[in-house]
Structures are given as C-alpha cells and as structure tokens.
C-alpha cells in the first residue's frame, strides 16, 4: 500500500492514544521508534497488515474494528492534509459521492501518487424507498470494514447526516484478473433525510428523466454527425452488438477507419479499466458510474511514418472517459479524451495539444501537471537537502558533544562553559586549597616485567578507578602522566571541607590501587601519596588546546612529600593535620613522621592512618564482603606482598645490569660516578651565573613554582 496509509494510521494512534502507545505498536511491529513513513513510498501489504494486527492487539480491539476506526479517521486526516475542498466539491448528495468514488480513487492512485496499485471499485444503487445499496469489490481480502467507517464519517462530515451502514452479503467472485472480494452494504439515512423529508435530496439522487424539463427544439439547430465528430474527436459510439456506429474525427483519420464498414469495439481497442470485467454491453451498463480506460490495438499513421527508426514511438494511444447510454439504451457513447497527464506522455504518443479541443480539460491538466512536476522536483531536491542538513546537524551535534567531552576532560566544567561562550578566563589565586600527588614506587619493576600493552592495561584500570573516587569526593584531576597523578581540592570550586575530602580521597586511592593486580607478578599495585595545603594559582594555558594548570610552591612541597612517603602510605603535612582538626566533620588518626628537609625549608609530616567516622567501604562506595573487616582499614594497611615487591625490584635491577653489560653500555653505578666527577670539576671552577648557580648546572626544582 502507499505510505499515506501508514502515515494516516500513525496519526490516528498518536491522536487518540498518545506517543507512548504509538511507539509500543511500532516497536512490536518491527519498526524503530523514530521511523518516518514516506507518503510517496510503497509498502508491502504484509507490512500494513502487521501494523493493524499489532495495533488491534495493543489497543484491545478486533482487527475489523481497527480497520473501521481507520476508515472514519481517513476522512478526517484527508481534510486536514489539503483534500478538504476537493471532497466538499465532489457531489451534492451521498449517492453521487459514492458513484464518484471510483474516479476519485483512480485520480488519487494514478495521478496524485503515480501508483500502479489496484484499488477497490464501488457500485451504488437505490435500495428500498429511502436506502442505498453499495457494492464493494477488492482484490485485497478483509479490508471491507474500512467502507463502514468511511461512509459514516463522509455522511457526517460532508452532508451533516448520520447513516447506518450494515453488511448484507459477503462472497468471493472470479473475475478476469482473479478472485475478488464482493461485499454488499446497505446504507440507511436518519429520520431527517428519509424520503418525503426536506433533506432527502442530500442523501439520494432525486433527478429523473421524467421530471427533466423539455424544450421544443427546431430541427435546424440539431447537431449533425459530421459536426459531432469534430466536437468530440475521440468519441466511440456502439450498439448492443458492440459494433461501432460512428467515431471521432481524430480516430477516423489517424487510424484509417474511413472505409471500414463493420468494426467491433474489441477490434479497435482493449479494455484496461475496469480490469475485472468482460467487455460486454451488459457489463458496460452495470458500470456506468465507473471510469473507463481503453488502449488502442494499433498505432496511428504518425507513428508508422518513421517505423523502424530510432525515433519510432511504440506506445499506443490510451483513451479515458465515461460511458453514456443514448437512444433509449440501444446505444452507448464513449465520451473520452487521450489519457495523458504530462508533456512526456504527449511526446511519446506523437500527439499535440492542438489535437485536443479547447473545451477539453485535458489540455489544462497536462500543462498544470507539468508545472506540478517541476514543483515536485524542486520539493524533492528541497527534501533531500533538508535530509542532508538534518544529517549534518546530527553529525555536528555528535562532534560537538565529543569536543565538549574532551574540553570538560581537560578543564573544570565552570571554566569549560565560559570557554564555550567565548569568554576570557583569567587566572585565579586560591589562598586555601589542598593538593594530592600520587605515584607508583614500583613502576620501574612493573615496566621491566610487563609488556607495554600490559602496562597500559594496568594504568588504564587504575586511572578509571581513580576518576570515580575523585568525582565522589569533589576533587579535580589536574594531570595524569605515566604513573603520577595530581589532584586538587577546593579548586576551582571553593570547598570549606576540602582537606577532609582530600584525606578521604587519598584513603580511597590507596584502597582502589590494591584492587588492581599486575600481570606476571600477580601482586597488587602499591601507591605512595603526599598531601599538602596552601595557596596556588590556577588558570588556562593555551587557547587551541586549553589545559588547566596549577602553579605554586604548594605543588612543589606536595611532590616532595610524596617522594618521601612510603609505599602503601599517605604522608600529609602538618598544615593539613591542623586544618582538619579545626572541624568536627571527621576524626582522622595520624602517626608522626618527623620533619622533612625540603628546599623550601623543614616541613613537619604525619602518616594518615584512618578516618574514625567513616569506613573504607563508605569512602570507596563499595559493599563489604563476608570475610572483610568492619571498617576495612585492616585490608587497607595490610603489608602482604611487601617482601615480594622488594625481591622483584632487586631482580629487575639485576636484569637491567645484565642487559646493559650485554649491550656494552655503562652500568648505572658507572654513570653515577661519571656524573659525580663532572660535578666535582665544576665546583673547582670559579665560573657561575648571576644567581650563584654553576654554569651548565640544571636547576631541577624551583623553590617558587612548578607547572604541571
């Protein structure tokens, strides 16, 4: 069926039952939820039937009731999509409307939608004093309930009446094109539209030949046969024996019929529509309300002139029109026109617009339809352009989301939003924040024993776990490089309890690291962590590839504290310990470690043991196993594997020494001795720069700041 059917039933379900029900029906019918049916596309009948069966099941209706409801909504949807005026000007009463259903169906299928599909046919006749009998023929089985809903809604919408539609008979008939379903309906009007009532003419045709006005015409104004042939150049008149009595002037001349005395209709042309009947006089009388289409069996003289050449046209002429009984039913005249709708059709037949009478609407139809085709081509290009733009917009949104994700990965969300808005983000000084620095003391041992792929796998797993804990405890990852991790608290968003959150974060990092096992060594990863608090300066570096950087002596001190920490331990400065003791939010337990001699001076440090108000399981947001301790600190500070790591480290240095010897390289000891001799020679000289540092001596660590 045409896609208009799918669009219409989708609109029906959406309007009456809502988008959720429509999505459920489409999903169960095998379609994606965001599918858009194309009005001009043709869908297999099995797809259409499946949609209606699924819809009936979901809505709790029978399939016949679903088709009947669709028939009622069909008229509503047609009126809302631009067909309202055409429907209202179809007929003056319901009977005439039903009589013209066949021609309207043909127009919609063949001209509006350019479809070759076979639609149903209808016959309407009076039934009793006030009723109508409607015959429905269709090659598709089971669609007859549509007619009941359609007729009821048509009567109510177009003629303001209520009718009762009942099925009288249903059977199968064998026609020329195959088996068709024949259903007979009775249509009864309401009380205001019955015979004898003022509005009866709105229901049934009251025109009869008996009450038609008669005029006394002078014989001098009667139309002669020659004039009639010129007025209707394509007409064909035949008698009950199907023998042609006279024919239009165009057919007479172009097909060489002047000298033919006895010519049957079947010798000149073959019936195309209605396709399911035999061409007999009786059948023609039965289908007077149906559009007839004939195809001529021979080519005109125009086409035979160039027969055999590349320009020869082989398409025969097709005539379309209506049958009208004349001479008290003893003859039938076929008033018709060439069945052409576009300029291309005329060219293929070697016809010309001048071959059609000026009163023939086919001339206007061809020119209007040609204009419509041009408009449709423009609309088609516009639709394709819109689809491309929509696709490009979707791709742009995907790229934008990827860019935003990368931007939010490197800079805090607040700053990222400002950068997206093209605002300048100046550097800020934060007088109070905490800094965490972590590294893996056994990274050298891991790199010797594991392949590069295995190292990447371990680090990736580790950092994924870290990111989750950082987000939970309101920290911000400034940098992750090799085995090092720099995290800040209270930057860029101020946080009154940044020290407490940072210490909980440090405990969580230690625990998560223990959950990662190094391949080949089968040992848990050990971290060492340093925590310090103080002022920093933070800002964006680079415009094309923005990075969030933290500068200041606090960063240097934190790095130094981390380097003096022990594997599996968190070493914090006294400033951090003093800060957390001011608040009663958490109660942390520390062990003194003494003073560290750093370049910036002595720093008192402590080892962090635990948070007495919060268990490890709460910190890492994980469930406690059956055999685990209540607070989790036994597992956190377990020294299992320490000796194995020491043995593995010694073995790793031994391997490197052997490799260096085999490659004829200097050992690490020899390199250190060479370096010491070089330094000794430099100290013997009196050359120095203005700051007192020897020439060529690298300034490894600045006492002022460090850029991460």
Curated annotation (Swiss-Prot):
GO CC annotation: guanylate cyclase complex, soluble
Cofactor: heme
Enzyme category, top tier: lyase
CDD domains given in the database record: CHD
Keyword terms: cGMP biosynthesis, Coiled coil, Cytoplasm, GTP-binding, Heme, Iron, Lyase, Magnesium, Metal-binding, Nucleotide-binding
Keyword Lyase attached: yes
Binding positions for Mg(2+) per the UniProt entry: 439, 483
Compartments (UniProt record): Cytoplasm
Coiled coil (UniProt feature): 368-409
Activity control, per UniProt: May be regulated by molecular oxygen. Probably not activated by nitric oxide (NO).
Chief subcellular location: cytoplasm
Free-text cofactor note: Binds 1 or 2 heme groups per heterodimer.
PROSITE patterns: GUANYLATE_CYCLASE_1, GUANYLATE_CYCLASE_2
Tissue: Expressed in a small number of neurons, corresponding to URX, AQR and PQR neurons.
Similarity comment text for this entry: Belongs to the adenylyl cyclase class-4/guanylyl cyclase family.
Identification of the protein by name: Soluble guanylate cyclase gcy-37
Lineage: Eukaryota, Metazoa, Ecdysozoa, Nematoda, Chromadorea
Gene responsible for this protein: gcy-37
């Amino acid at each position: 069926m045409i896609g208009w059917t799918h669009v219409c039933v989708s609109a029906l379900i959406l309007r009456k039952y809502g988008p959720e029900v429509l999505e459920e029906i489409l999903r169960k019918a095998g379609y994606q939820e965001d599918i858009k049916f194309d009005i001009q596309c043709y869908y297999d009948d099995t797809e259409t039937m499946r949609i209606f069966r699924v819809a009936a099941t979901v809505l709790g209706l029978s399939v016949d009731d679903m088709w009947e409801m669709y028939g009622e909504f069909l008229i509503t949807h047609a009126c809302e999509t631009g067909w309202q005026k055409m429907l209202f000007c179809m007929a003056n009463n319901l009977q005439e409307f039903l009589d013209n259903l066949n021609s309207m169906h043909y127009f919609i299928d063949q001209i509006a939608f350019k479809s070759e599909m076979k639609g149903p046919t209808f016959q309407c006749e009076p039934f009793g004093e006030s009723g109508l009998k409607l015959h429905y023929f269709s090659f598709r089985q089971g669609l007859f309930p549509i007619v009941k809903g359609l007729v009821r809604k048509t009567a109510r919408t177009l003629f303001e009446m209520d009718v009762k539609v009942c099925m009288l008979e249903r059977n199968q008939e064998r026609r020329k094109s195959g088996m068709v379903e024949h259903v007979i309906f009775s249509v009864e009007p309401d009380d205001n539209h019955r015979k004898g009532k003022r509005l009866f003419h709105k229901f049934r045709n009251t025109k009869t030949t008996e009450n038609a006005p008669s005029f006394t015409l002078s014989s001098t104004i009667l139309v002669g046969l020659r004039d009639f042939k010129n007025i209707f150049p394509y007409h064909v008149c035949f008698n009950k024996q199907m023998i042609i009595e006279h024919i239009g002037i165009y057919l007479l001349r172009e097909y060489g019929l002047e000298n033919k005395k006895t010519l049957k209709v079947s010798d000149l042309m073959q019936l195309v529509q209605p396709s399911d009947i035999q061409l007999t006089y009786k059948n023609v009388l039965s289908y007077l309300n149906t559009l007839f289409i004939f195809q001529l069996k021979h080519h005109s003289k125009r086409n035979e002139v160039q027969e055999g050449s590349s320009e020869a046209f082989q398409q025969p002429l097709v005539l379309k029109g209506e049958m009208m009984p004349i001479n008290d039913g003893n003859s039938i005249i076929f008033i018709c026109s060439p069945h052409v709708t576009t300029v291309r059709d005329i060219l293929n037949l070697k016809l010309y617009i001048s071959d059609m009478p000026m009163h023939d609407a086919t001339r206007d139809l061809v020119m209007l339809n040609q204009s419509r085709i041009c408009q449709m081509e423009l609309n088609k290009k516009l639709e394709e352009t819109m689809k491309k733009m929509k696709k490009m917009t979707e791709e742009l949104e995907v790229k934008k989301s990827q860019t935003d994700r990368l931007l939010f990965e490197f800079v805090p969300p607040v700053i990222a939003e400002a950068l997206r808005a093209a605002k300048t983000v100046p550097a800020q000084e934060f007088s109070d924040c905490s800094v965490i620095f972590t590294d893996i003391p056994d990274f050298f041992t891991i790199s010797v024993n594991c392949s590069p792929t295995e190292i990447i796998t371990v680090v990736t797993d580790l950092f994924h776990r870290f990111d989750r804990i950082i987000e939970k405890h309101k920290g911000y990852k400034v940098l992750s490089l090799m085995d090092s991790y720099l995290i800040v608290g209270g930057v860029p968003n101020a946080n009154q309890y940044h020290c407490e959150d940072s210490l909980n974060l440090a405990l969580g990092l230690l625990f998560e690291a223990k959950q990662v096992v190094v391949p080949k060594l089968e040992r848990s990863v050990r971290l060492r962590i340093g925590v310090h608090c103080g002022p920093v300066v933070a800002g964006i570096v680079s415009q094309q590839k923005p990075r969030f950087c933290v500068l200041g002596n606090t960063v240097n001190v934190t790095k130094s504290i981390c380097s003096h920490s022990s594997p599996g331990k968190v070493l914090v400065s006294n400033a951090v310990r003093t800060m957390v003791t001011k608040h009663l939010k958490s109660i942390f337990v520390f062990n003194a470690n003494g003073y560290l001699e750093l370049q910036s001076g002595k720093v008192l440090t402590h080892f962090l043991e635990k948070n007495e108000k919060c268990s490890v399981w709460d910190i890492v947001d994980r469930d406690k196993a059956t055999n685990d301790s209540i607070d989790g600190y036994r597992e956190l500070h377990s020294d299992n594997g320490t000796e194995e790591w020491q043995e593995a480290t010694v073995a790793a240095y031994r391997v490197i020494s052997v490799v260096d010897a085999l490659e004829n390289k200097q050992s690490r000891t020899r390199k250190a001795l060479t370096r010491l001799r070089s330094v000794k020679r430099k100290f013997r000289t009196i050359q120095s720069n203005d700051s007192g540092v020897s020439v060529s001596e690298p300034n490894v660590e600045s006492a002022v700041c460090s850029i991460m």
